[in-house]
Each structure stands twice: as structure tokens, then as C-alpha cells.
Amino acid sequence: MPARTSRRTFVRTMAAAGAAVGGMSVAAQESGRVAGFDHVALPMQNVEAMLAFYRGLGFPMNETPNVVSVYVGSQMINFHRPTLWQNATFTLRAPAATPPCGDLCFVWEGSAAALSSLLARLPAKIEVGPVERQGGRRKGGSSVYVRDPDGNLLEFIIYA
């Protein structure tokens, strides 16, 4: 004779099966989920050149003695100054990260001509592009790639 299952166990089992079919774990249903990125952090070497470059792109910034926060919409990039990332006591970082270690993609809302003009004024040499790419929005766009003064790879994607 099969063992009797409590109603609570049965309901949890059915919820888990339904969640698995729907692609979401029971833990995610019960306790929350990751909703997106808040910020990324990168070490920077050429501080003044980096500040001028990202200001030239039009990003608002907040400077502190150890970190420069560059705001991109509702997210930010924290650039760690050399005084921070070269300090052996600072451990809340990727231990082997040194400039250039970033590969970032920005969404450009404007024409390809306006982007090319801005990049030329910085100046930022286009390394590749325009090329068709699949972006984080799960649809195609046209991208160009440049490097910032530290050598981090920056992609600018224009969604169709």
C-alpha cells in the first residue's frame, strides 16, 4: 500500500513541478530573484584621461578619493583608483584584475552618425564596426567597438 502524503507535501511537490516546468525554482518563487545589475567595478590606471573620456561621453560622475562612480542610466561603473586597487588590504575586488580588464556594452540612443561624431571628438578610434550583434535585449543591433584610455573594450550598440 502506498505511503500517504500530507496535503502540505503534495502542494509543495506540485508547486515545485509547476515551477520547474515554468523555468523558475521554488526558492526563487518563495524568496525573490535577481532583478538586474546595480553596478560593476573596474580598476583604472590613467585617472585624468579616464575622467575626461567618460565625461566626454556625457556620463554623470561622483568622485571620491578612492572611487569614481560613472552613472549609466540607473546603473553605475565604479572605477577604482590605483590607490585603492593596488592596496593589498583592499580585498573586496577581483584579486587578479588590473587595467585593462573591462569589456562593456552601452546602448546608444541616437544615429550612427551622431555616435561616430562623438567618438571622433573624444578621440576614440573605432576598432571594429559597424557590425551586426545580438544584444542583451535579445534582439539584433549594430555595434561599434572602441577602447577607453586604459584599454578597456567598449561596445556601443544601436538597436533597430
Could you tell me what each predicted segment is?
Residues 1-18:
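N-terminal secretory signal peptides and thylakoid transit peptides that target proteins
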Residues 21-48, 102-104, 160:
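N-terminal beta-strand motif that seeds the catalytic metal site of vicinal oxygen chelate
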Residues 28-30, 89-93:
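Short beta-strand/turn micro-motifs at beta-sheet edges
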Residues 36, 66, 73-75, 100-102, ...:
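Residues that flank catalytic or metal-binding motifs in active/ligand-binding sites
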Residues 42-86:
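Core segments of cupin and vicinal oxygen chelate
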Residues 44-49, 99, 103-150:
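Vicinal oxygen chelate
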Residues 82, 157-160:
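Short beta->alpha transition motifs characteristic of CBS
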